[in-house]
């Protein structure tokens, strides 16, 4: 058996990407960090994106923080998802930053959300906070594209949320809007403001917003593919 090592270049095919992701299954984050030559933080309070960065190193991801997918040549986005002992998601999943201005003529088909979710490599990771970060194990990966029904659900929520943004109602949107997709503030601090449209069409400053997949959506997705019990 060949020694496990990070991919130094982006994988040339989905099959190679999935094969590498499958090899990581069962390893702890600490083991993978040591083999990759990086330090494991004590917790994720100041390093929220650390797990994603670690797996990007192992899988040869190319995009970094650019708007394209993590594996641009393959059109695949990488999403790590913390799960409990039953394989259920512990938190919502960030998709992308929401555009709050310049949205005339934008459609679901050409939207950034749909582009990011067209093809996703889901990698579940143990997320129970009672387990030290270095001891949390990586689960089996899943290469996924939305079904017709999932695409319909996402589109309906996206259209509702974008209508509210365009009509100057961004400040009225709460995390309860949307069945499977939600919009909520995404900023490291409350002073990081961005331009948006106000209720009377005037420019306003507000917190940046991000699109997130709700837990019910990702739970159903994982349950269906991994045959988990889905209450």
Curated annotation (Swiss-Prot):
<dbReference type="InterPro" id="IPR011337">
    <property type="entry name" value="DNA_rep_MutH/RE_typeII_Sau3AI"/>
</dbReference>
<keyword id="KW-0378">Hydrolase</keyword>
<keyword id="KW-0255">Endonuclease</keyword>
<comment type="function">
    <text>Sequence-specific endonuclease that cleaves unmethylated GATC sequences. It is involved in DNA mismatch repair.</text>
</comment>
<dbReference type="InterPro" id="IPR004230">
    <property type="entry name" value="DNA_mismatch_repair_MutH"/>
</dbReference>
<dbReference type="Pfam" id="PF02976">
    <property type="entry name" value="MutH"/>
</dbReference>
<keyword id="KW-0227">DNA damage</keyword>
<protein>
    <recommendedName>
        <fullName>DNA mismatch repair protein MutH</fullName>
    </recommendedName>
</protein>
<dbReference type="InterPro" id="IPR037057">
    <property type="entry name" value="DNA_rep_MutH/T2_RE_sf"/>
</dbReference>
<keyword id="KW-0234">DNA repair</keyword>
<dbReference type="GO" id="GO:0005737">
    <property type="term" value="C:cytoplasm"/>
</dbReference>
<dbReference type="InterPro" id="IPR011335">
    <property type="entry name" value="Restrct_endonuc-II-like"/>
</dbReference>
<dbReference type="GO" id="GO:0004519">
    <property type="term" value="F:endonuclease activity"/>
</dbReference>
<comment type="similarity">
    <text>Belongs to the MutH family.</text>
</comment>
<keyword id="KW-0963">Cytoplasm</keyword>
<keyword id="KW-0540">Nuclease</keyword>
<dbReference type="GO" id="GO:0003677">
    <property type="term" value="F:DNA binding"/>
</dbReference>
<dbReference type="GO" id="GO:0006304">
    <property type="term" value="P:DNA modification"/>
</dbReference>
<dbReference type="GO" id="GO:0006298">
    <property type="term" value="P:mismatch repair"/>
</dbReference>
């Amino acid at each position: 058996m060949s020694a496990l090592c990070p991919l130094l270049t982006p994988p040339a095919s989905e099959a190679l990407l999935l094969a590498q992701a499958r090899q990581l299954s069962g390893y702890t984050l600490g083991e993978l960090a040591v083999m990759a030559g990086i330090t494991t933080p004590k917790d994720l309070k100041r390093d929220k994106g650390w797990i994603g960065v670690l797996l990007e190193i192992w899988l040869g991801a190319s995009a970094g923080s650019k708007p394209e997918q993590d594996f641009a040549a393959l059109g695949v986005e990488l999403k790590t998802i913390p799960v409990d002992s039953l394989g259920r998601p512990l938190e919502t999943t960030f998709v992308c930053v929401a555009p709050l201005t310049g949205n005339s003529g934008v459609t679901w088909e050409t939207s950034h959300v749909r582009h990011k979710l067209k093809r996703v490599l889901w990698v579940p990771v143990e997320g129970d906070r009672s387990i030290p970060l270095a001891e949390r194990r990586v689960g089996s990966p899943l290469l996924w594209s939305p079904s017709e029904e999932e695409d319909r659900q996402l589109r309906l929520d996206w259209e509702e949320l974008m209508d509210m943004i365009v009509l100057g109602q961004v400040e009225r949107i709460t995390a309860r809007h949307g069945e499977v997709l939600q919009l909520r503030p995404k900023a490291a601090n409350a002073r990081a403001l961005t331009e948006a449209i106000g209720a009377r069409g005037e420019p306003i400053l507000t917190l940046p917003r991000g699109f997130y997949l709700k837990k019910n959506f990702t739970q159903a997705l994982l349950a269906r593919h991994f045959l988990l019990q889905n209450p």
